[in-house]
Amino acid sequence: GVKSVCLLDNEKLNETDLYSQFLAPPDKIGGNRAEASLQRAKALNPMVDISTETKAVDDLPDSYFPVFDIVCATGLKQEQLERINNICRDNNKKFLCGDVWGMFGYMFADLVDHEYSEEIVQHKAVKRGPDDSEKSARETVTITVKRRAIYVPLQNALSADWRKPELRSRLRRGDPSYFVMKILLRFRDEYNRNPDPATRKT
């Protein structure tokens, strides 16, 4: 199970935040979002040690992140996400990131070099009797197979040059939401905020 969790956020809680998460109560508006979420987060599982960090990601040294077995990031700029991901990879730590904009969201996982087990169902022929003329029956057998997955860093996933012939052929088979994600990440990088659903203005 989970031994400990650290909530890292340097932003202040506002009214809009209350529509996207349930950990921070309304009476904590104006306070730090991580600290405002601490009490309800602890109530989810009193056996887990939950702490907070109120510094900005850019103010934390590279040595801060390898302390954790897995780092989950959201609401950050692409450069910040890539920095944290690279630190995690260099220290063989797992990294997840994602975001939600209205009805659209994405999730990225970099588990570096990940081994896992998968159950495979096989059908084997089994003789019903000692006589070769007897019809054989089919028996269902479940076996456990070890698998290995090698992940790529976020920087590689986002820097693919789709003008290259070897990648251009994949465009029709690919998911167009990949490019929506890139546009939204670029918007945040350029304007230092998310698109405003109340207006079309940039």
Label every PLM stretch briefly.
Residues 1-202:
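Adenine nucleotide-associated cytosolic modules
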